[in-house]
Amino acid sequence: IDGAHIQDKKGEEGMRGPHILFLSRSKGIKISGVKLRRASNYAFMSYDIERASFDNLLVEEGWDGIHIRGGKDIRIRNCRFYTGDDAVAGGLWKNMVIENCYMNSSCNGIRLIMPATGLKIVDCEFRGPGKYPHRTSGEQKRRNMLSGILLQPGAWFPAFGEVKDILIS
């Protein structure tokens, strides 16, 4: 699925267009074997999802690869990310597993911006500099990866709750 990097001067930051896939209040989701390219915003954006699996995805360019705000029993496995922003981001996660993924980013591999409980990050590889420039770095076209894993609940806005039961191996 090609998002074509559509720019919208009335969009977020005066440039962002639509997400490639957007789901809200959904359960029992399986996305497998899909290639998501040149997202005009996030490749996958969701609010309040449960029992979701993402397997064997290839995400290239765009902003965030997978951005989940509110998720329970989520599995992200065997995916390859080459993003111009965070590979996986969001928060309010309960029982999320991110396993055997390759993350090449010009921002962060995994960025937690809200609380999470039961997060497991297993056998993932984080590699910079990014293949594609950071989407909002303008003429600078910054490619350096800032962090492999960044746990910063409340960094964007007040986010109440705990970060607990985190495993990184």
Where are the model-predicted features located?
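Extracellular/periplasmic carbohydrate-active domains that bind, remodel
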Residues: 1-169
